[in-house]
Amino acid sequence: MIEATSCGGVVIYRGKILTLYKSYKHKYEGWVLPKGTVEEGEDYKDTALREVKEEAGVTANIIKYVGKSQYSFCVPEDTVEKDVYWYLMSANSYYSKPQREEYFVDSGFYKFHEAYHLLRFSNEKQILEKAYNEYLDLKKANLW
């Protein structure tokens, strides 16, 4: 078994959530939240911000840590167990530009119910729901 760690962001601008569409050689297709692997010497917050910038072209600010998701997948002759640490983030505009080199072909900011139904993976839906509720609480308290 191989253990891996990634970090990502639930990025919100004016109540809408950033999602990315990945299409990899017709083997993997679907809407996801931006996330990626921690590089050597990098802390989790820096990883999350870097991945949002690289994958979506979005400059974001971390508001707070919202939780961890876990999943596993198979690679030739082994299984990867991955932990993903998620942060609630704010963006400064609706601008996004998907990173084609990583097979992202579309990106955009969507209303909660749209983003929730677009997302391919249930663990990302759970994180989205938790992060969005945190956002609503902050907004209600005039802290967003």
Residue spans for each PLM region:
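Unchanged
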Residues: 38-126
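Charged phosphate-binding loop/patch that engages nucleotide di/tri-phosphates or the phosphate backbone
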Residues: 117-144
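N-terminal strand-loop-strand
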Residues: 1-33
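A generic structural signal for ordered secondary structure
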Residues: 8, 13-18, 44-45, 65, ...
